[in-house]
Design a protein with these regions (language model features):
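Short, hydrophobic/aliphatic alpha-helical segments
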Residues: 28-36, 65, 166-176, 217, ...
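A charged helix-plus-loop insertion that forms the helical arch/lid used to bind
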Residues: 79-95
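Divalent-metal (Mg2+/Mn2+/Ca2+)-assisted nucleotide/phosphate chemistry catalytic cores
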Residues: 12, 90-211, 218
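N- or domain-start disorder-to-order transition segments that initiate the globular core
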Residues: 1-27
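Conserved nucleotide- and phosphate/pyrophosphate-binding catalytic cores
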Residues: 199-392
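Short, hinge-like loop/turn segments at secondary-structure boundaries
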Residues: 82-87, 132-136, 227-228
Length: 392
């Protein structure tokens, strides 16, 4: 993302209003570019990193990154694309997660050129009359144009009043920070457009919108998602990150080069030719090295590649692996997998056990009700590429 053309084209699905944004970028004015992230869990993943890297590209062009940590919006959860209401998340948890977010975010953004605002900064101070005033700025006609709400009604599935407030809250964030541009996934288009409406209602110039594609998850089919557990976390160690990239299907390699690196399009086409010529594994190693290097440096990427080769070419465990202490002498195998962050849900843990993908000290786990005795440290392996030393 070294220039304006790359910024506006790479991984971008739609721009509102493109001509206005191009003129603003050409004007030399310092733009306020907003990106919001909801800290419903502590992890950011490579899908989030794409827009963070877009935001960094704006910074490199001299613009101000305005980062919204949605500790209040996260308590509701974005209803877009969901056929039922999300479970409520405790505000204390979202606040704590937001602080962990920043450690990951500043692996990408320039801290000195970034404004950070939790949206509790304004929502926690609003009284009910102010909430009603905000609600009066958006018509029910607009709300009912949301495809998700229309589909729920058509399927006789309920949606609740608090869900209606999500797009209002995201939009009001833009008012409070006076955003010139907002970044977001295409699936958030309704929320982003609501921001423009609210800015107009509050007498502000409407923000331009840059809407991006989504990154495919590890299966190469569905969107990378925290809820699906198919993600590569920015908190993963170099070895974990490298191994997870190596698990994606060959069909997703070009997509990952486009969305997760700055490799030029011409080079990506050359990589795709090599894949067709049977060099898929080697190209994937180069991809995994490149991605790991972005977040862990060349030294970390090189060591992760060596660990990978040792594990799979020589059938050895990595020399170094992450450690996790549970504070108890016994823990269920499913609980250990979830608490350590190796999986996102009980259903994912059970599925992996059922498929024979979980081992303790090299022994396959066949019982999802197994209780692990941690009187001595053990090696927990999930899948072919994830190893963790666990202890009490």
């Amino acid at each position: 993302m070294k220039n304006i053309q790359d910024l506006l084209c790479r991984g971008v699905k739609e721009i509102v209003v493109k001509k206005d944004l191009e003129q603003a970028l050409a004007s030399g004015k310092c733009l306020r570019v907003k990106l919001g992230l909801d800290p419903n869990i502590p992890d950011l993943h490579l899908g989030h990193a794409f827009n963070l890297r877009k935001l960094r590209a704006f910074q490199d062009l001299g613009h101000t990154a305005v980062l919204i940590i949605g500790d209040y919006t996260a308590t509701i959860g974005d209803p877009s694309g969901k056929d039922k209401s999300r479970e409520a998340v405790d505000a204390k948890a979202t606040s704590a997660n937001g602080k962990i977010f920043l450690e990951q975010i500043f692996k990408i953004l320039d801290k000195d050129k970034t404004e950070v605002h939790p949206n509790s900064e304004w929502f926690s101070k609003m009284n009910f009359l102010e909430v009603l005033d905000l609600a009066s700025k958006i018509s029910m006609e607009h709300i009912m144009s949301h495809e998700t709400f229309r589909q729920r009604i058509a399927k006789h599935q309920p949606f609740f009043l608090h869900e209606i407030f999500y797009p209002l809250m995201q939009g009001y964030d833009s008012v409070m920070v006076r955003a010139d541009v907002e970044l977001g996934a295409l699936e958030q288009k309704f929320n982003l457009l609501t921001g423009r409406r609210l800015q107009r209602a509050f007498g502000q110039k409407e923000q331009n919108l840059l809407m991006t594609d989504y990154l495919l998850g590890l299966d190469g089919r569905e969107k990378m998602s925290k809820s699906l557990g198919n993600f590569i976390s920015l908190r993963d160690s170099a070895t974990q990150m490298f191994g997870k990239v190596m698990s994606i299907p060959d069909t997703a390699i070009g997509h990952y080069f486009e969305m997760c690196t700055d490799i030029r399009e011409s080079e990506i086409k050359e990589f795709e030719k090599r894949i067709k010529a049977g060099e898929g594994k080697q190209v994937k190693i180069e991809l995994a090295h490149k991605i790991t290097e972005i977040y862990h440096g060349e030294k970390g990427a090189k060591k992760a590649e060596q660990d990978f080769e040792a594990v799979f070419a020589q059938n050895k465990m990595p020399d170094k692996m992450d450690k996790h202490s549970f504070g108890a002498q016994k823990i269920s195998i499913v609980g250990a997998m979830i608490e350590s962050g190796l999986v996102a849900s009980r259903s994912e843990a059970r599925r992996l056990i059922e498929q024979g993908g979980v081992k303790i000290n090299g022994e396959k786990v066949g019982d999802e009700n197994l209780v692990v005795n941690l009187s001595k440290p053990k090696i927990l392996q999930v899948g072919k590429r994830r190893f963790l030393k666990i202890k009490k």
